[in-house]
From Swiss-Prot:
InterPro entries: PLC-like_Pdiesterase_TIM-brl. Its cofactor is Mg(2+). The lineage of its organism: Eukaryota, Metazoa, Ecdysozoa, Arthropoda, Chelicerata. GO terms for cellular component: extracellular region. Dermonecrotic toxins cleave the phosphodiester linkage between the phosphate and headgroup of certain phospholipids (sphingolipid and lysolipid substrates), forming an alcohol (often choline) and a cyclic phosphate. This toxin acts on sphingomyelin (SM). It may also act on ceramide phosphoethanolamine (CPE), lysophosphatidylcholine (LPC) and lysophosphatidylethanolamine (LPE), but not on lysophosphatidylserine (LPS), and lysophosphatidylglycerol (LPG). It acts by transphosphatidylation, releasing exclusively cyclic phosphate products as second products. It comes from the Eukaryota. GO terms for molecular function: lyase activity; metal ion binding; phosphoric diester hydrolase activity; toxin activity. Disulfide bonds join C45-C51, C47-C190. Its EC number is 4.6.1.-. Its main location: secreted. Expressed by the venom gland. The active site is at H5, H41 (nucleophile). Mg(2+) binds at E25, D27, D85. This is Dermonecrotic toxin LspaSicTox-alphaII1.
Length: 272
């Protein structure tokens, strides 16, 4: 999965698709009542990027629906995975459940078209705080209450704060999550980071733990990209998708890796 990083404006969805991604990540900001209001990163953000692009959340979800509904004139067949990078650190811990309810209501209405032939993409709810595990519960219970539990087959989870893996697993246990788990690891492209924790996450994935997939962010250099692939990640988030596409054509990688497509279940751990 090539994950386009910080795609917060509608026009950037098409820009990143043209650059060769099959997945995009965007930032969700909440108001004081835990309502998701707009896609926006703000300052500081990655080096060499503009941090100030934004859209209203409902408009952005509608744009995503058009691009992932077969038969729509804006349809992009290769766009198969989203990462909702939810900026919940602005909320109190006891608002996490409400944030999950509000995320579910918005996604159900604007992306899933109220359960009527909505967008087909899979997506990851990425949470930056282990104490906000109840967001998952709020999301799941809201979708079930609408009579559409099958839509949860399209939803996965990630805690994105680089916490210790056992602590991450405990947070999932509290809300009964046993699958659909991606583990992220990384840092802004301005700073170097070792792959020690990525390797720990990959080991946990391959030992049959709760983690199904691992992604690394933000890899913009050829060397970092190769190191992440060598560590065995399933996805790489990048500002420059051509770098990863170039590396995947190199002799060392072209027979080991390929771009994921819609038939590849993002919740199933890959077994070579």
């Amino acid at each position: 999965w090539i994950m386009g990083h910080m795609v917060n404006a509608i026009w950037q969805i098409d820009q990143f698709m043209d650059l060769g991604v099959n997945s995009i990540e965007f930032d969700i900001n909440f108001d004081k009542s835990a309502n998701p209001i707009y896609t926006y990163h703000g300052v500081p953000c990655d080096c060499f990027r503009s941090c100030l692009k934004w859209e209203y959340f409902g408009d952005f979800l509608t744009a995503l629906r058009h691009r992932t509904t077969p038969g729509d004139k804006l349809y992009k067949e290769k766009l198969i995975l989203f990462v909702f990078d939810m900026k919940t650190n602005s909320l109190y811990d006891n608002q996490a459940y409400t944030a999950g309810v509000n995320m579910a209501n918005n996604i159900f209405k604007y992306y899933w078209n109220n359960g009527n032939n909505g967008g087909r993409s899979y997506f990851i709810l990425s949470i930056p705080n282990l104490n906000h595990y109840n967001l998952i519960k709020g999301f799941q219970e809201t979708i079930k209450s609408k009579g559409h539990p099958e839509l949860l087959e399209k939803v996965g989870y990630d805690f994105s704060a680089n916490d210790d893996i056992p602590d991450v697993e405990k947070a999932y246990q509290k809300v009964g999550v046993t699958g659909h788990v991606w583990q992220s690891d990384g840092i802004t492209n301005c700073l170097p980071r070792t792959l020690t924790r990525v390797q720990a996450a990959v080991k946990e994935r391959d030992s049959g733990g709760v983690i199904n997939k691992v992604y690394y962010w933000t890899a913009d250099k050829y060397s970092t990209t190769r190191d992440a692939l060598d560590a065995g990640v399933d996805g790489i988030m990048t500002n420059y998708p051509y770098v990863l596409n170039d590396v995947l054509k190199e002799n060392a990688y072209k027979n080991k890796f390929r771009l994921a497509n819609y038939e590849d279940n993002p919740w199933v751990t890959f077994k070579p």
